[in-house]
Amino acid sequence: MTVYAVGDLQGCLEPLKCLLERVAFDPAKDRLWLVGDLVNRGPQSLETLRFLYAMREAVVSVLGNHDLHLLAVAHRSERLKKSDTLREILEAPDREALLDWLRRLPLLHYDEQRQVTLVHAGIPPQWSLEKARLRAAEVEEALRDDQRLPLFLEGMYGNEPAKWDKKLHGIERLRVITNYFTRMRFCTEDGRLDLKSKEGLDTAPPGYAPWFSFASRKTRGEKIIFGHWAALEGQCDEPGLFALDTGCVWGAKMTLLNVDSGERLSCDCAGQQASAKPAGPPA
């Protein structure tokens, strides 16, 4: 069995098919890991979900911010934005099956055999892997609970609280956990988030840095695969970290990583690009 990890899809199905063809992916024996943001802004969000759902036994995916946004819109906790390409999913006859599968995906996946973690945006520097797994489980429980789901989706939007505190409770606690796993790029050493800056490493506000750059980061030594940050262009010099968002939805490329060998392949995404970069959430 070979495990392949692929960066943010965002509804770009053809580049994914291109990559899977190139490695002769066999869902009967291989596994496909996805860093989240399966849908939105690309041309084939519905087809992408259907493709993944059809081979769901071979797919391991974490949730990204765009996936959560889709769930929020579907449950009428949020409205569609002009840049969203989600309407086809919302009007599809199989929407309930697709959305139910989506809501049951984790925020964080840890492979015991390979000792590799899969997450959309990252893990804040002040959390160990053990604590990160526990915090992710809190949000996952809310997503999978029929009664708690609408309340979570309605309250998950927002940039505050900007920093974790173990005394937080209720929706504020779940919101900051969600922001760490699905929206984080820059933060302070103690985990205070800046969610406005979305470009490259040299655009960090004073006192902030990429989440993975701190010497005190408690997940140093862990292998972590992540996406979300297209401006990195797949480059991350930190040992054990693999950045896979290479900007497919902006017309750049989609990247596949052989998790066991470390080999990377990319497929050109010209013609897939969204019309304009977003100015606000769910970035």
UniProtKB/Swiss-Prot annotation:
InterPro entries reported in the protein's UniProt record: ApaH, Calcineurin-like_PHP_ApaH, Metallo-depent_PP-like
One Pfam family matching this protein: Metallophos
Keyword Zinc annotated: no
Reactions catalysed according to its record: P(1),P(4)-bis(5'-adenosyl) tetraphosphate + H2O = 2 ADP + 2 H(+)
EC id: 3.6.1.41
Disulfide bonds: none
Gene3D superfamilies in UniProt: 3.60.21.10
Keywords: Hydrolase
GO molecular function, one term: bis(5'-nucleosyl)-tetraphosphatase (symmetrical) activity
Family, similarity comment: Belongs to the Ap4A hydrolase family.
Entry function: Hydrolyzes diadenosine 5',5'''-P1,P4-tetraphosphate to yield ADP.
HAMAP family registered for this protein in UniProt: ApaH (MF_00199)
Protein name: Bis(5'-nucleosyl)-tetraphosphatase, symmetrical
Species this chain originates from: Pseudomonas paraeruginosa (strain DSM 24068 / PA7)
Lineage: Bacteria, Pseudomonadati, Pseudomonadota, Gammaproteobacteria, Pseudomonadales
Gene coding for it: apaH
